[in-house]
Design a protein with these regions (language model features):
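Structural motif
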Residues: 18, 91-92, 117
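N-terminal Rossmann NAD(P)H-binding glycine-rich loop of SDR-like oxidoreductase domains
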Residues: 17-37
Length: 285
């Protein structure tokens, strides 16, 4: 409450770290850290890993290798002062701490106070809508970017459809993408399965208030653009549910296990680019 009144006037050029990965020792956090450790260019960025356990963080750092070892910072999602301390030292906090509907907002608030950009890999569309409704104006006033849904939910779908739409527009007929179907084949390696954070997120959503979830979804879908309005999103979600035959993939398909996230996100991103209304089905073999 009143968070915009407490935003600190600190320029991001003064920050000690370009990126802090919060929740670095979880499944998703480790993947992000491995990427950062091995993809540094000629001018490596200074970055840090953050979490509750110093021992686990140090073990992670020693396993990474690479030319730019991250620093270790301690913070707890339930300790607001520790979150503010790491936010003040970073240009961007990348949070891999979920479920976000239970653990995400304190770090978002810390980033707003410290004028620090935020990114996450949540698939909790209802939570993203809630955060936008609660903190969107304060973030815009502070020049802070809050970027969600940056992982498997829903980057592959968004990029694939962006490339398809661009190819159609550049083609001889200058066509527009109006109908699309994504078909995913999941290959789970032996001993593999869903990350613990994903399972906790699903369980948290199942135990949440249905009205609260609906309000969050509605807030996310809120747009003056027809493509991102609630009815086209619901139509695409219903179209993803049924068992059907895909002539393009040559197989029967069911709803993708993340269709409830990917469909509204794709509609939102298409609407933001001024695209025509889209009928999109998210399916898997």
């Amino acid at each position: 409450e009143g968070i915009s009144r407490h935003i600190r006037r600190m320029t991001r050029d003064d920050r000690e770290f370009s990126i802090v990965v919060f929740g670095a020792t979880g499944d998703a956090g480790r993947a992000v850290c491995r990427y950062l450790a091995t993809k540094q260019g000629a001018r490596p960025v200074k970055w840090a890993v953050a979490g509750r356990s110093k021992a686990k963080l140090e073990t992670l750092v020693s396993s990474l290798g690479g030319s730019s070892a991250p620093s270790v910072l301690l913070a707890d999602a339930c300790d607001a002062s520790s979150l503010l301390r790491i936010a003040e030292r970073a240009t961007l906090v990348f949070s891999a701490v979920g479920p976000y509907s239970r653990l995400g907002e304190p770090m978002v608030k810390a980033c707003l106070v410290a004028r620090t950009h935020w990114a996450d890999i949540t698939g909790e569309v209802f939570w993203v809508g809630e955060m936008e409704a609660k903190h969107g104006e304060a973030a815009a006033a502070a020049g802070v970017t809050l970027t969600s849904l940056c992982g498997y939910d829903s980057v592959p779908c968004e990029l694939s459809l962006h490339v398809a739409r661009k190819a159609l527009k550049l083609g001889a007929r200058h066509s527009e993408l109006l109908d699309a179907e994504a078909v995913t084949q999941l290959n789970v390696p032996e001993g593999g399965g869903a990350p613990a954070g994903t399972l906790l997120t699903v369980l948290t959503a199942l135990g949440s208030n249905a009205l609260g979830l609906a309000k969050g979804y509605a807030a996310f879908a809120r747009s003056n653009d027809e493509s991102a309005a609630l009815w086209p999103v619901l139509r695409s979600m219903l179209g993803s549910l049924s068992l059907g035959w895909s002539p393009q993939a040559g197989c029967f398909t069911l709803a993708h296990f993340m269709f409830w996230c990917n469909v509204p996100v794709v509609h939102r991103s298409f609407g933001a680019r001024g695209a025509n209304p889209l009928r999109f089905r998210d399916r898997e073999q």
